[in-house]
Amino acid sequence: ETAVVQPSRIARLERGVPRQDISLYQYYRHLVVSIDYIKSERNRDRFLNAAPDLIIVDEAHTASRTRGGKNVRQQQRFEFLKQLARDPSRHFIMTTATPHSGIEGSFRSILGLLDESFDTDPDQRLDRKKLTPHVIQRRRRDIVNWLGADTHFPDRVTADREYQLSPEYSSLFEDIVTYCRETVAATAGAGTYRKRVRFWAAVSILRSALSSPRAAEAMLEKRRARKRGTEDVDSPSDEAFASQILDSSDSEETPDYIPTAAFDDAGFSDSEIRRLDGFLKRAQGLSGPEKDGKVRAAAEEVDRLLGEGYSPIVFCRFIDTARYVAEQLQAILGNKHRGLVARSVTGDDGGDQERKVLVGELSEESVRVLVATDCLSEGVNLQEH
């Protein structure tokens, strides 16, 4: 019998165990369980003491060792799997679509769960002959016909859509670019730490400004709460800032919140604060299709797809942008497409289960648009909805 272990099912599963001296992890032959549930302090030891001989880890890249331990939850997953892997008689099957994200250390930490000798310095070459028996790669084209069945992968159609910045938006963006150039150049004689923080603060502002007026507004508003920084001190690495700010296929989850880490120690002067406040006021007046050409172009594309009978999904980088786009699509297209429900689902909407519920509720609407961040890129088969 297969037992799906969830908090809501624990009581029923335990009632099905015939003896009190064994746990449900010993009794049920096959278990399906979330690693985040089983690694908790309450459940970890019970599972470790009765772990099965074969363990299959899905989405294994989310349990790789993190850079500097920044992602606490992911680091806990890795440490938990490492404990399980210590038993040489235990079999591990780890599946992932993104085993190597470009971060060699994270990739090797996964391999190290299979054989500790693989978890070496990234500069040291791996023995490919020794590695080969442990790794199986199957690309999409390799499994179009799989075990006698057609897999029917959807065709991927890519296209670029240009949009024009309104004069007001273009003026704000050019002024922000000028400010960023000046603030980075002004650190020419400063210490390495200050240069690095100022650089990442500038990139944060630019990314937010290009994402949406709402993201720019949120970025600049959050900046207000930041205190002046200090000169060279022990500081986060470039990777710590990059993981917040840049798009990534890293094994760690890409955060969808506005990246303000670099502002903590950016050390803005009073004149810079006044200048940023001016940008904030201008950003507040750019929402809507009249002055935001990007959301206008998005609405035109969504309008076309709705007219063709599709239920579009719009992905955004930041939470604030996703909420803004959903609001705008509802306002722009609601009258034309009767019964339209445009809804955002982001990393701010609870855990995986809560987000699945929200997506499921939206799928019941006959005319719908989902606006999401990358938190929905895994774990939910959006094509079913």
Regions found by a protein language model. Name each.
Residues 5-15, 35-40, 316-320, 340-356, ...:
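Conserved helicase motor
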